[in-house]
Design a protein with these regions (language model features):
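Conserved class I S-adenosyl-L-methionine
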Residues: 88-96
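Class I S-adenosyl-L-methionine
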Residues: 1-18, 25, 157, 162-242
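Conserved SAM-binding motif I beta-strand of class I
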Residues: 110-115
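S-adenosyl-L-methionine
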Residues: 1-88, 116-155
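Conserved SAM-binding loop of SAM-dependent methyltransferases across substrates and taxa
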Residues: 97-109
C-alpha cells in the first residue's frame, strides 16, 4: 500500500465524518490529496466506529477496501473468540483484515498472520505495530501452502471463504475455501487446538460428520442475530459435543 501523504492524512482527519459520495464529487478542489485513498480510509473509519470501536481513535490504522471490511469480524465477536484460545503460539491461516488475529494474538506469546492478498498483508504489517502487537509476524502466502510447511504451534485459526464462484453464500464445508474437512488430519498434526469460523447458515449436523474431532460448538449472536458459528477441534474425537 502506498504511504499516505501529509496532505491526504490531514484531509482524512478533517473529513472523517463526511459523506464519502459527496467528497468524491469534490475531488478537483483538492489536487494535492489522493482522493481515492482518502475515501477508502474515511469509509473505513466510519465502519470501524461501529464494528471496531477500540480502533476508532487510532489515527495510524489503515483500512482496506469496503468489501473486505464488510466481511470481517466485529470487535464483539473477535473478543469472544479470543476468550476461548490462549497459549504460546498461534497461526491465523486466513488473515484477512486482521481483526480476529489482532484480538486472538493477545492471548499468545507469538502469532503468525498468513494472507495471500498482498495489499491486506501490507495493511496488517502496518496496523499490528500501531496496535502494539509487535509479536505478530506477517506472511504473504497461501494458507494451505503455509500449513503444509509450518512448524507445529499451539493453536490454529481459520476463517474459510464462504462465497461460491457466483458470489452467493454457501452452506456446506465443501463449498468453502479452503475445504477444512479435507485438511482436518493435517491441521491436527500441526496444532493441538483448531478454531474454525463458519457461516451460521452452515449445515451443522453435516459439518460435525465431516469434522469428527470437533470438541466444542459455539454459536455467536449479537443483538439476537446469529453472526458466527465456531468449531473447536482437538486431538481426540469426543462422544458428545457440548
Amino acid at each position: 500500500m502506498t504511504p499516505i501523504s501529509p496532505e491526504t492524512r490531514q484531509f482524512i482527519n478533517e473529513h472523517q465524518s463526511d459523506d464519502v459520495r459527496n467528497l468524491a464529487l469534490q475531488a478537483r478542489k483538492y489536487p494535492d490529496v489522493d482522493i481515492p485513498a482518502a475515501i477508502t480510509q474515511i469509509a473505513g473509519r466510519q465502519i470501524a466506529a461501529e464494528k471496531i470501536p477500540s480502533w476508532k481513535e487510532i489515527d495510524d490504522i489503515w483500512y482496506p477496501k469496503h468489501l473486505s471490511l464488510e466481511q470481517c469480524s466485529s470487535e464483539i465477536t473477535a473478543r469472544y473468540k479470543a476468550s476461548l484460545l490462549q497459549g504460546e503460539s498461534l497461526a491465523d491461516l486466513t488473515g484477512g483484515f486482521g481483526i480476529d488475529c489482532s484480538f486472538l494474538a493477545t492471548g499468545f506469546r507469538s502469532a503468525t498472520y498468513v494472507e495471500r492478498q498482498t495489499e491486506l498483508c501490507a495493511i496488517a504489517a502496518h496496523n499490528f505495530p500501531a496496535l502494539d502487537l509487535n509479536h505478530i509476524s506477517v506472511r504473504n502466502d497461501d494458507g494451505v501452502a503455509y500449513l503444509e510447511a509450518m512448524s507445529p504451534v499451539d493453536c490454529i485459526f481459520l476463517d474459510p471463504a464462504r462465497r461460491n464462484e457466483h458470489g452467493g453464500k454457501t452452506v456446506a464445508i465443501s463449498d468453502c475455501e479452503p475445504n477444512v474437512a479435507k485438511l482436518e488430519g493435517l491441521l491436527l498434526s500441526k496444532a493441538n487446538r483448531i478454531m474454525i469460523k463458519l457461516s451460521p447458515m452452515l449445515d451443522l449436523s453435516q459439518a460435525l460428520k465431516e469434522l469428527p474431532h470437533t470438541q466444542e460448538v459455539h454459536i455467536i449472536s449479537v443483538n439476537n442475530e446469529c453472526k458466527e458459528l465456531l468449531l473447536l477441534l482437538g486431538q481426540t474425537a469426543p462422544e458428545e459435543i457440548p
